[in-house]
A protein has these predicted regions:
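An exposed, glycine/acidic-rich loop-and-rim segment of catalytic or binding clefts
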Residues: 1-341
Length: 341
């Protein structure tokens, strides 16, 4: 179902909203501005429960938490807003101090995407990112497909192709709270399990400052499920006020890389992906972000589980075998599936 809002987006045109429903009554909603995942209502014990943090549609351009947005051209950070590509230095638009975050000041989250096709259980959006966009080289054609299945899962597929070599790293920035996403209870009371043996330390600005580290004997060891609170703000988390680090996903696509469980264990979320890494962000700076009810969220109200490449990969050739630099004319394809049980 496609509808337009009575009010306008920053480009002066109405937002276009798409709603999908499955046979179990699960309802998801998306919009063309930023290809944003607006809402996810899952049936739990005979009632629909909102599990996605969100705000009023008209507030999306003003919030800075990237709620539910598709981010690019390069998700996460690129140090000093520049990197070497061949013999050239690519200078990007900085938007977080001297660094670039999530593609720059006018990243993919701040664009109107075209609704290409809307079916019974899916919607497909497209965007053309021109050569020089936020400093990146190459004309890039991007497609995002959201699919809702009757198994209560949401699958996100990213397809892209560039006519020049370019940095490319696409993800969705949804925040989950399986207990209370409307007001945002403390997500640290959830239990988390990660299928990951290595994580990437960063400095206080989110820039990698160390090689990959094994999780053993650290607070980043989630190979056995534990409450997020258990080792919170220990070790390499101190400089980021909580978890805001990337993990290398153990390559077993048929197995979830994430299992998130609500405090009373009445709902869980499994994440499967073809991506190489996962950024876990516990909403350490969510305070002041608007809610759907006109209130504001507090810090730690939701957890972002962003499947992607490692941050700053364009400046680290040793990580580019995972992903991060897209060759001209080659198809980019990544998928992530969020299963609610």
């Amino acid at each position: 179902m496609l509808k337009k809002t009575a009010f306008n987006a920053p480009d002066g045109q109405p937002y276009q909203l798409v709603q999908l429903t499955n046979s179990n009554g699960m309802i998801v909603q998306f919009m063309d501005w930023g290809v944003t995942w607006l809402s996810c209502k899952v049936p739990v014990n005979g009632e629909l429960r909102e599990v996605l943090l969100g705000c009023k549609v008209e507030d999306y351009p003003h919030q800075t938490a990237y709620l539910g947005a598709s981010v690019g051209r390069y998700a996460n950070r690129i140090a000093n807003a520049q990197f070497a590509l061949g013999e050239r230095t690519i200078q990007l638009v900085a938007n977080q101090g001297k660094h670039q975050l999530h593609g720059g000041k006018e990243g993919f989250d701040k664009r109107r995407w075209k609704v290409e096709e809307c079916g019974q259980n899916f919607v497909r959006f497209s965007l053309v990112s021109p050569d020089g966009d936020q400093g990146f080289e190459g004309n890039v054609q991007v497609t995002v497909i959201y699919t809702l299945t009757d198994e209560n899962s949401v699958k996100i597929e990213y397809e892209a192709e560039s006519d020049k070599d370019t940095a490319l790293n696409l993800t969705n920035h949804a925040y989950f709270n399986l207990e209370n996403a409307e007001q945002g209870s403390d997500v640290r009371n959830h239990t988390l399990r990660l299928n990951a043996d290595f994580y990437l330390p960063v400095d206080g600005e989110g820039i990698p400052n160390s090689p990959l580290k094994h999780v053993v004997n650290t607070s980043f060891d989630f190979r056995v499920a534990k409450p997020i609170t258990q080792d919170f703000q220990q070790g390499d988390q101190v400089v980021t006020k909580g978890y805001d680090q990337s993990f290398i996903v153990n390559k077993a696509w048929q197995k979830p890389c994430v299992l998130l469980t609500s405090p009373n264990e009445d709902l869980s979320l499994e994440v499967l992906t073809s991506q190489a890494a996962l950024q876990v962000y516990t909403g350490n700076y969510l305070a002041g972000t608007p809610t759907r009810e006109g209130d504001t969220y507090q810090d730690f109200s939701g957890i972002a589980l962003e499947t992607q490449c490692l941050p700053d990969t364009p400046n680290h050739p040793e990580w580019q075998n995972y992903c991060g630099i897209q060759k001209a004319g080659e198809r980019y394809y990544r998928w992530t599936e969020f299963r609610f049980k």
